[in-house]
Design a protein with these regions (language model features):
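Structural/interface elements that position substrates and couple domains in central-metabolism enzymes
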Residues: 1-188
Length: 188
C-alpha cells in the first residue's frame, strides 16, 4: 500500500527482500521474466550507493569524520536489524574510516550482537547524545521520536549542521531555518 511508496534509502528486513527474490525465481521457472521486479531489486541496491556517495561528496572523505546515525532497525517499532539498510550504511562508512556513533530506540542490543562492525562503532544513550560533536547526521530509520527532536537543540549539539535524511522525516525549510544544510531523498 501507500505506506511502502515513500522515497527513502530503500527497503530491507528479513521478509520483503526474500519475497521479491522468490517472485522473480517463480516467474523465471514459469518462463515469464518479471523484469519489473528485477529492476526494483537493482534500484534498491543502488539507493545505498547513491546515499553514501552524497555523504562522501559533502564530507570529501569519511576517514576520521564523526558521523551520527539515527536508526539501525529496518523499520520503526522493531529491534530487527536483519537485512537492514541502516546496517549496510553503517558498515560502508566504517569501512571507509568514519567514526560512527549510532542510536536506535529498540535495536541497540541486537545490533551489538549481530553487527560485524559493532566493536568499531559507538552506541549512544539517546539521539541527541549520538549527534554530539557530529560533522553529519544520517537518519536511517523513521522513528517518530527522531522527527520530534528539537532542531535548535540538535543544531547546538552538532559540530557541523549537516543532515542526510534517508527517510525524509524533517521539513527541509524548517531544517534550513535552523541553519542546517539538509539533504533528503527524492526532494530535488
Amino acid at each position: 500500500g501507500r505506506s511502502f511508496l515513500s522515497a527513502g534509502l530503500g527497503y530491507g528486513g528479513s521478509c520483503f527482500p526474500k519475497d521479491i527474490a522468490a517472485f522473480i525465481a517463480i516467474s523465471e521457472q514459469l518462463g515469464v521474466p518479471f523484469n519489473l521486479l528485477k529492476e526494483v531489486q537493482s534500484i534498491n541496491a543502488r539507493q545505498i550507493d547513491r546515499f553514501v556517495d552524497a555523504i562522501r561528496e559533502a564530507l570529501w572523505v569519511f576517514k576520521e569524520k564523526k558521523i551520527a546515525v539515527w536508526g539501525l532497525s529496518f523499520k520503526p517499532n522493531t529491534d530487527d536489524v536483519r537485512s537492514s539498510v541502516a546496517v549496510g550504511l553503517v558498515e560502508r562508512m566504517v569501512a571507509e574510516g568514519a567514526d560512527v556513533t549510532v542510536f536506535d530506540p529498540k535495536a541497540m542490543e541486537k545490533a551489538k550482537e549481530l553487527l560485524p562492525v559493532a566493536k568499531k562503532i559507538k552506541f549512544a544513550d539517546s539521539a541527541l547524545a549520538a549527534a554530539e560533536g557530529a560533522e553529519a547526521l544520517v537518519i536511517a530509520t523513521e522513528w517518530p521520536e527522531f522527527a520530534a527532536v528539537d532542531l535548535a537543540e540538535l543544531r547546538e549539539k552538532m559540530r557541523t549542521p549537516l543532515i542526510f535524511d534517508g527517510r525524509n522525516i524533517f521539513d527541509p525549510v524548517a531544517a534550513a531555518n535552523f541553519g542546517f544544510q539538509y539533504r533528503g531523498i527524492g526532494r530535488g
